[in-house]
């Protein structure tokens, strides 16, 4: 019994670990959970945060350049005199010093650099927001594709079940001679085709799950199971804000637009820094030092005191002719400033194109959804009536299969319109700086 107890404990422990692993593997992910996880773990987002931290260090360095520098130095040397005429063939020399330096004036270049680095820090923070928005768009697209594919699998399974029931009934009718073998073969072929569509839809779903899993940087052993909601119709048919209001809001909240504005400010500071090259620079230096020699008549302590020296210097540099370096720097800074204006304008136009496309997609998809839902209603009614008439011998096999395929196609059209609408609405939410919609 004593030997069995440790074995039982180990078995219970392993069983608990397996259960925990299974629960983790079977975790379902809502859209918001996917977004929250990606914001913390996606590599591109993390790299953009590292770039922001690196820029903060550059700002600290730019600020430190305003303060004096201080350097302590010492040199120890040994000299050998091989000539026999020298009494002491060896000489030891030591020097010691402390030097300080400070730039007093450089045309305001140092302070301008501090301002530019602060602007760059703001731009880096906005770049992080851009990365977050980019991964959000990618995840929303992949998630909606997963939901669409999951619903497509469900519809294909339902269609295959109906085809199987028709095939089974036709088999009985074949035994009684109510239908021909050709009609039965057509229904059998339709059932096989519907089974094949289940496999295709399942493969498509697995592919979309893999894409979503890769966006979240999940481990190979972790499974991606999106939570399939019962989408509320009011979320699909929700009223859209006016297009011009969406664009005006996007201009205020989208990080790339604000980054473009700061890019202009940074370019202006770059031009100011380049113009500083035409101004004189003044720097101050100061040092103290001493030293000693071993073959001197004085003791080392006396030498250090007697050799003690102080130095103060003021350096003035006046640029007279710099081989056009300063003029070239200013002209290139002007060109860069013009480029920054063009980049800002380009970002605004790109945002307008993307926003208008998403808005048009949302409007069109909502109209398609209403139309497809109406079509599905009558296609279902037609299919049900055709099925009843087939049972009593009024409709033939071709008419039954045609009605079934039309109903299945109508269901797929409803799905496409529904999830295209939800995707477009989510994109409009991003352009307005809104959180993800609650589609559950």
Stretch-by-stretch model annotation:
Residues 1-31, 440:
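Bacterial Sec-dependent N-terminal signal peptides
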Residues 23-28, 73-102, 229-239, 272, ...:
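Small/polar, glycine/serine/threonine/aspartate-rich low-complexity segments that form flexible
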Residues 97-99, 143, 247, 313-315, ...:
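Membrane-embedded beta-strand positions in outer-membrane beta-barrel channels/transporters
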Residues 50, 193-218, 376-434:
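Short segments within alpha-helical structural elements
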Residues 134-249, 361, 365, 407:
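Periplasmic alpha-helical coiled-coil/stalk elements that build and connect Gram-negative outer-membrane
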Residues 46-50, 63-64, 104-132, 186, ...:
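Sec/SRP-type N-terminal targeting helices
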């Amino acid at each position: 019994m004593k030997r069995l107890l440790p074995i039982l404990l180990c078995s219970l422990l392993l069983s608990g670990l397996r259960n925990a692993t299974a629960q983790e593997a079977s975790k379902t992910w809502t859209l918001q959970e996917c977004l929250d996880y990606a914001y913390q773990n996606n590599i591109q987002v993390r790299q953009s945060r590292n770039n922001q931290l690196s820029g903060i260090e550059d700002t600290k360095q730019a600020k430190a350049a305003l303060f004096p520098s201080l350097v302590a130095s010492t040199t120890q040397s040994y000299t050998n005199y091989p000539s026999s005429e020298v009494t002491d063939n060896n000489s030891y020399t030591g020097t010691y010093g402390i030097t300080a330096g400070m730039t007093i004036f450089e045309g305001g270049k140092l302070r301008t650099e501090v301002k530019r680095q602060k602007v760059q820090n703001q731009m880096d923070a906005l770049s992080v927001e851009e990365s977050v928005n980019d991964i959000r768009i990618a995840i929303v697209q992949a998630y909606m594709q997963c939901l669409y594919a999951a619903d497509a699998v469900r519809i294909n399974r339902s269609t295959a079940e109906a085809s199987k029931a028709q095939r089974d009934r036709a088999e009985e009718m074949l035994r009684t001679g109510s239908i021909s073998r050709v009609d039965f073969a057509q229904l059998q072929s339709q059932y096989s085709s519907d089974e094949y569509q289940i496999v295709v839809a399942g493969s498509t779903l697995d592919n979309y799950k893999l894409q979503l899993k890769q966006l979240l940087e999940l481990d190979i052993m972790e499974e991606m199971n999106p939570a399939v909601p019962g989408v509320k119709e009011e979320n699909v048919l929700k009223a859209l804000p006016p297009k011009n209001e969406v664009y005006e809001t996007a201009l205020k909240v989208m990080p790339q637009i604000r980054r473009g504005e700061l890019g202009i400010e940074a370019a202006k500071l770059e031009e100011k820094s380049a113009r500083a090259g035409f101004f004189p620079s003044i720097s101050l230096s100061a040092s103290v030092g001493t030293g000693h020699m071993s073959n001197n008549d004085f003791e080392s302590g006396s030498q250090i005191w007697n050799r003690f020296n102080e130095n103060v210097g003021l350096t003035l540099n006046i640029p007279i002719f710099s081989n056009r370096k300063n003029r070239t720097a200013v002209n290139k800074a002007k060109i860069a400033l013009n480029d920054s204006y063009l980049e800002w304008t380009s970002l605004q136009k790109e945002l307008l194109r993307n926003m208008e496309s998403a808005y048009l997609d949302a409007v069109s998809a909502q109209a398609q959804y209403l139309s497809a839902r109406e079509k599905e209603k009558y296609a279902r009614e037609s299919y049900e009536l055709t099925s009843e008439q087939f049972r009593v011998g009024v409709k033939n096999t071709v008419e039954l299969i045609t009605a079934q395929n039309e109903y299945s196609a109508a269901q797929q059209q409803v799905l496409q319109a529904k999830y295209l609408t939800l995707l477009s609405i989510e994109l409009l939410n991003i352009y307005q700086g809104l959180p993800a919609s609650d589609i559950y």
